[in-house]
C-alpha cells in the first residue's frame, strides 16, 4: 500500500466528510470542513491511499501566536494499526515548525 501525506485542499473535502462520518458519533458537516479549509489559522494533513484515492486519515491544527492546538485526528478503521496516525502527527509537526510553533497541544 502506498500512502501520500499532503496538506488538505478542496479535492479532499468529501473524503474527509466520509471519514468523519465513519469515525465520529458527531461528525463534521461539509460546511464545517469547508470553513476549516478556508480558515487561515487551520492546517490539515491528510493521508490518501494512492491505489484507491481514498482519504484514509487526517489531522488538523489551529496555529495561533506560536502555539498549535490539534483539533481533530482520524484514521479509517480498516487502515488502523499501521502507523498512519503517527505519520500524520509527524507530518503535522513539520507543518507547525514552518509556522514557528513552540508548543503543540491536543484540544
Model feature map: region roles:
Residues 4-80, 86-99:
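Acetyl-CoA-dependent GNAT
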Residues 70, 104-106:
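Conserved hydrophobic beta-strand within the GNAT/NAT acetyltransferase core sheet
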Amino acid at each position: 500500500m502506498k500512502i501520500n501525506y499532503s496538506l488538505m485542499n478542496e479535492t479532499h473535502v468529501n473524503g474527509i466528510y466520509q471519514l468523519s462520518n465513519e469515525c465520529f458519533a458527531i461528525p463534521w458537516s461539509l460546511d464545517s470542513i469547508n470553513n476549516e479549509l478556508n480558515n487561515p489559522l487551520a492546517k490539515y494533513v491528510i493521508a490518501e491511499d494512492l491505489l484507491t484515492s481514498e482519504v484514509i486519515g487526517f489531522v488538523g491544527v489551529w496555529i495561533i501566536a506560536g502555539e498549535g492546538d490539534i483539533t481533530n485526528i482520524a484514521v479509517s478503521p480498516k487502515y488502523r494499526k499501521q502507523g498512519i496516525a503517527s505519520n500524520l502527527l509527524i507530518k503535522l509537526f513539520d507543518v507547525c515548525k514552518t509556522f514557528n510553533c513552540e508548543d503543540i497541544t491536543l484540544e
